Amino acid sequence: MSTHPFTICLWFDNQAEEAAKLYTSLFHDGKIGKIARYGKEGFEFHRRPEGSVMTVEFEANGLQFTALNGGPLFQFNEAISLIITCDTQAEIDHYWNKLTADGGKEVQCGWLKDKFGVSWQVVPTGFHEMMNSSDKAAASRTMQAMFTMKKFDIAKLKAAFAG
């Protein structure tokens, strides 16, 4: 049995290999696996040149992914996002800066979209515990602080939580 119970498939127009290279470069354990290419078969359906990249298998942050060049039929949206949990502000800054580079977009409350349109959340360790604290006043202050941010500032979130 596989050590990974499932693989996340990301449907791109034609940027699968570029996306896999970016995502694997972000994480110390990132690596690209098998690359499958389109053949002559099925051209009437896929309309891709023979030999062009069809799928790229890769691993990033311990997760298995397949990036598919499936064409413009489907676009990414915020209904699905990938969450990166960070221990330090330097980690948050690293992921945030890399993922918003070259056309990525900052969104609100720790969310961003990378240049491919994939949604990410870059959050500090302990964030969900602060938001779900039994101390409702502390959780409320944390939420108020969160709504003022795009990229999270750990010190400001902790200060808001502490009151």
What feature does the model see in each segment?
Residues 6-8:
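Hydrophobic faces of well-ordered beta-strands that scaffold small-molecule active sites
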Residues 127-141:
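A short, polar/charged loop-to-alpha-helix boundary motif
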Residues 18, 94, 138-141:
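Extracytoplasmic/secreted proteins, especially bacterial periplasmic and envelope-associated proteins
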Residues 12, 16, 26, 60-64, ...:
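Vicinal oxygen chelate
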Residues 139-163:
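Acidic/histidine-enriched, glycine/proline-rich intrinsically disordered or flexible terminal extensions
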Residues 40-45, 66-68, 129-130:
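A short, acidic/glycine-rich surface segment
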Residues 10-62:
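Core segments of cupin and vicinal oxygen chelate
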